Structures are given as structure tokens and as C-alpha cells.
């Protein structure tokens, strides 16, 4: 992009572009944003717009493309989705008043995490940017959603927990020091996210003192201790660097970030990304969509704020039984108060997304339509406050925040918006037509002049027609030529001498007159003044909204909570959910429980409920067997989902549920090859299992749906057996575990471990087929019904028949390998071949081991027996060698 011989405008462009080389520059020129050089070549195919060139006749024309200002948000969104940043460069002075080149500057930088425009955001999901820092083995991270004013900070020395938390936040952008990708402490976390959403800042931005100063200046406080930041260091560094990034990209102070929410990872039920994915809490396994997820079932919220808060409650279930019960009390009250709940939900439907509306107002991005939405919201508040008086729970009240005084101020703001903003206000303030004329006397005067001008224009046209005798004469206006008289070519001969030609057209001529010039100056002067005054009044109104932003954010917090609680009550009422009893111990008791998602997805089929009990005495580890498709996975996931639902404050689909608080929730459910990182199914299984064994506590809940399938049968059985024993014996107390398996041998654990119980999913055989009863019953089963399931899946009949023959031979201890001729290879006739895990000498060792009665042996006898077996093993090994 050489600037030699460039025009002043292009020199200005190149100068601005030089400062934003990592972004596509949207350069404002009139009603368009233009892109040039490499930016144009990159953006045109992504945006599916024409790539043209500036100065086409030059030997080296400049590639260019452009998009209309009015449609820019959509184009910016597409670039962001494709991994680009966009620097928006505006004309910062009135072109009509400019002396020479119009002054321009970048007013904001749009990145994946720095989005505030509603059209580019998902209404029910926060849009987080996260910043990472570390010191002395501790990783700190801060997260901001600039669209809602949320600012959170956390730090931990538990690196695995940090990983899980970052993935739970699911940021749209990650900010790191320039050395972060090569930093041994940060690189494992940086690598979790694709390069397209990583942003680097200079290392100097990650200075502790600088961070403290930035944050106290932002929050207008003397220290950060009031936010609970005592002892935090890398967390503060991350927060300070992130604040600098936010203010820099927005080219202003993000004044709606008024405080820090400090939290600890262990404040909430710990669920890693594997568990969240396997349980399909907020995204399904099929296509990462919302359908078929827990949030899809529970989200009956009527506001966007409520949907976001519900998602947060779901991903951050509580650990305090007292706090859980406070939420459950509120849900119970809303469930019982049907009439009030219905009225409250109807009023909440009139409440727009106050968080994002207010954020846009503070950041100067609010539109006239936003103000109308805010007005409607504010007028709904008094009625909402009145209805909420029927409830006793403090969750259902504005008394705490914003309080009576705050509500009064917001009522005044509502009256102001009603008086000021026209109901038919356009999307943009650019051309006026937003402010009610009666709101300001000078505006009313200018509107009258403009209105009278239109009448005068009509009279002038009629007069000219009469004077000239040209009945087809028209007086018109456009932004390029102003006012003009247009005469068809057939009537040009009748044009008076005092008409001055202004433009020649194919079908006629355009003229001006002295009288029309006088009218134009008067009319355009009034119109320009009206638009300018409206813009000034609009800015003043936005300033008043901004002044009320603390109260508006307070209303948003309360309204979101009310919406979530009423939504949970509505779901409970509609689908026969019950309040879970929160126990002080570790028991989990579910009577006739139903999977919340599966029961809603069944069409015309009756859901079969199941009861289950887990405790720390005799039912701590449940071995669950049964055929594929019988419903083992549904039972397992249901119990895990009940823990999530109860601890987030939701009722559960059951006849009765009593739940102890779970501190960590682990799932090992199925597996897919992670080919990108070279991991097989079996390796993924083992890593997930290792995570469970290494991190589960006696207060955790573990759900394992098959283990060991990715290796040989005997290896898999051995591993599954050992893992089950390890979970039973973990920390000397064990951990509550649901263990579904196809290895029926594991049912023997009930005889060797005191807290193991066998269960199976009942199946009924009928006419050589099976009927899934979907019922969990106590006891084991030794059949998998794999062939019957294969038939149901559509495997051809001959294959099924052959499988049944092979199964029968194997069950009888023989299997005949037949050559193509129908005879066994090398024998001339078919013959049995015994399938055995061990060779004969090894079998002798196995037989000897089976006869050993450890319970009757002294320690010395046991050692002697072990020595004997070891000697025999050495002998067998030498013989084989």
C-alpha cells in the first residue's frame, strides 16, 4: 500500500490503516463504508459483494469495495463470524463545514468479544471476552461482557479447575500477554482456543500496580478491597489489562463497568467440559444446537435477561443447601401463586433487554427504537412491583434495589421518554423525525417552517405551471442538486428566459430560478436546523438515561431473577415436577423419576419412570446391566441432571426426590476419537476415567456409562473391574457411582464389596424378540440381547441367523472355523477349536489361584503361596521363551 502520489483522502486512509493493521478498516465516505487494497480483496468474497477498483484507468488501480452504512451491522457480523476484526472509521466533522479534507478517526473496534450491537448478539447467551495472567503458580482470569456490563474475576492454583472454568465460560475472545503463547504457565490454556479469537497485548499492560490504578480510577474508589479483592494478584492483573483493552477498542471509558464480581471456582458445583457436554446442558451432542438440551426444557423465560441468568444458574449450581433452599422457596411460592405468576409473566413480556439497552446507551450506541423499548419497559415496572407484593420471598421485590427512590427516578425517566420520543421514530437519528415537536419550542417552530415549506413548494409549482403553461412541470428535490424545476423535453421550448438550466436529462431538463433559490435557502436552513436540534436533544436524553444506568442495571438484575424463578415454577406446574428435599447427608433418593428431556421428546409413547437410591452405606456403587437401547444411559443421566437441577434451584420430574448436595459431578459417557490431537477412543476413555479417580471426593457423584470398550475384551473387563473397585474404595470412603456396563462379570463385585448393588434394566422376551420394559430393577442379568437389538436395528436375517449359531457355539465352549469347502483347515473335516483366554500352562496358574482361600490364610502362608505362584510363573515364562 504505497502512498506515493496518493490523493489527500487516500493518504488519510493509509495513515489510519497503518494504526489498525490487524483489522479490516471500514472507512466512512458519505453513506458508505469503503474498504481498499488488501482489506477489499479479503472482505469482498466473505461479504459476497462486488470487488471493484478506484481510479480504474491508472496503471495500478486500487482494489475497493463498500457497504451501505445503514446495513453495516450485518456485514460487520459476517466478518466477525469469519474470524476478522473490524475498525470502524467515521467522519468526525460535518462535511459541509469541513475546510478541505473531512476529518476522520476510528471510533470503535469490533472484535468477537467486543460486540454491543444487538443484531450481532445471541439474546440468551453472554458474549464474554476473557483475559489471562499468572504469577507464582496461580492463574488469574477476568471476564467481561460489554453488552451487559458484567465484569468477573477469579484465580486458582488448580490448573485443571482453571481449564474447566475457561471452557465453561466459553469466551468469544481471549486476551493474553504477547508472551502468552510461549509461556509454559499460560500456553496450555491459550491452546484451548483457536488463533482467530486470541488477542495479544504488550506485556507492559500486565503490571499489577498499573492494573490497580486503572481499576480504582474506573470504579472511582480508593482501593479494591470493597470488591473482595484482598490477596488477589494475577486476577487483578488480568482485570486491569482487560479493562485497558475494552476502553481502547471502544475509544472511550466503558463507564457501565462499575465494579468487580470476585468468585471462586469451588463456590459452585464443579462440572468439567466433558460432563457439561455429555449431559447436554446447553448444547446437544448431535450438532451443538439447543434442541434436546436441559436448557431447552427449562427455559420458559420471557425476557432475554432471564434466559441468560438461567443459563448461568445451570452452569453454576450452588453448593450451599441454605442458598439452594432460598431459591426453591421462591419457586414453590411462584408455583402456588398461579394467578400472580401469570400476571407477572405477562408484565415481564413488556420488559425489553434492559442490560443491553442500558449498555448501548452508556456507550453511545443506542437508537431511537431502543429508547421506545426502554420507555415501554419502565412503564411496566409499577404494575410489576404491585403484583410482586403478593409474594413473600425477597427475590420478588424491588425494595432492595433499586429501591423506592430509584423506582421514582425511573418513573420520571419514563415520563421524559414519553414526552420526547415519537412513537413512529425511525431507526436512526441521522435524519431527525425522532423527537416530538412539542418537546422543545424551537423544534416546534422549525417543524412548522418545514411543514409550511411543503405547502409553499406546492403553491410555487402551481404558480409556475400557470405562468408557463407547462402542465407537466414539476418542482422536486434531491440531496445532490437541491430544489429544481423539471420540464419534459417536449416542453423545453416553452421555458421562460429567466429559467437557468442546471442539468440535462435524456427525457428533459432541470432548471432553477431566483425565487426557487430563496425558497431553498429558507427550507433547507430550517430542515438542517431541525435535524441538528433533534440530534442535540437526543444526545441530552441519552445522557439522562446514562445517569440512571445504576438503577436500570439494578432493575435488570431483579427482573432477570424474577423471570427465572417464575419460569422454573411454570415448567414445574406444567410438567408435574416436585420440590427436591435437600439433605444434610450424602443420600440421593429418587422415586419414580423421569428424564426431563427424554420425556418431553417422546411423541405418543408413555415414559416409564424409575426409582433409585444412592447412599454411603449399602448402595454407594450401583452396577447397572442390560441390553443396548434398554435405557441404561437415560437412567444414569437422569440422576446427574437431577443433581444439577436441584442445586440450581429447580424442581425435578419425580414423585419424590431427596438429594444430598454434590460437590463435583463427573461423567464418563461414550467417546469419540479425538483425531485432531491423535487420541483414540480408548485413550479418551482412559483420560476421562483418570480424571474421575484423581479428582472425585466422597461428596461427588460419578456416572460411568461403559468403560473399556476401546480395547480387547479381557483388557477392558480388567480395567472396568479395577476402576469399579477403586471408586468403591476411594479415600477409604468411596464415592457415589452409577456404573453401567456390558461386562456382566462385574456383578460379582456385589459379593466382594459391601456398598455395591446390582441393578438391571428389565426386558421381556416374546416370540424370539425382546420388549424393552425401561424399568430399573434390583439384581443382575447375564444376558445382553445383542442379537435381538441387531435385528431391531435392521441387520439382515441371514446375518442374524449366523450370529445366533456362532453365539450358541461360543456359549457351549466351542467354535468351528470352516474353510470355503466346508471343512476345517488342515483336517478334511470340521472340528471344534476351543476359544481360551489362557494357554494350558497359564491355566494351571489360574486354577491354583481360584483354589486359594485368602480369608483363612495367615500373612506368612499368603507370602509363601505368592512365592510359589511366582516361581511357577517364571518357569512358564522361561518355557515360552
Swiss-Prot record:
GO terms for cellular component: cytosol. GO terms for molecular function: ATP binding; ATP-dependent DNA damage sensor activity; damaged DNA binding; mismatched DNA binding. The lineage of its organism: Bacteria, Pseudomonadati, Thermodesulfobacteriota, Desulfobacteria, Desulfobacterales. The keyword DNA damage applies. Keywords: ATP-binding, DNA damage, DNA repair, DNA-binding, Nucleotide-binding. InterPro entries: DNA_mismatch_repair_MutS (IPR005748), DNA_mismatch_repair_MutS-lik_N (IPR007695), DNA_mismatch_repair_MutS/MSH (IPR017261), DNA_mismatch_repair_MutS_C (IPR000432), DNA_mismatch_repair_MutS_clamp (IPR007861), DNA_mismatch_repair_MutS_core (IPR007696), DNA_mismatch_repair_MutS_N (IPR016151), DNA_mismatch_repair_MutS_sf (IPR036187). Pfam families: MutS_I (PF01624), MutS_II (PF05188), MutS_III (PF05192), MutS_IV (PF05190), MutS_V (PF00488). The gene is mutS. Belongs to the DNA mismatch repair MutS family. This is DNA mismatch repair protein MutS. This protein is involved in the repair of mismatches in DNA. It is possible that it carries out the mismatch recognition step. This protein has a weak ATPase activity.
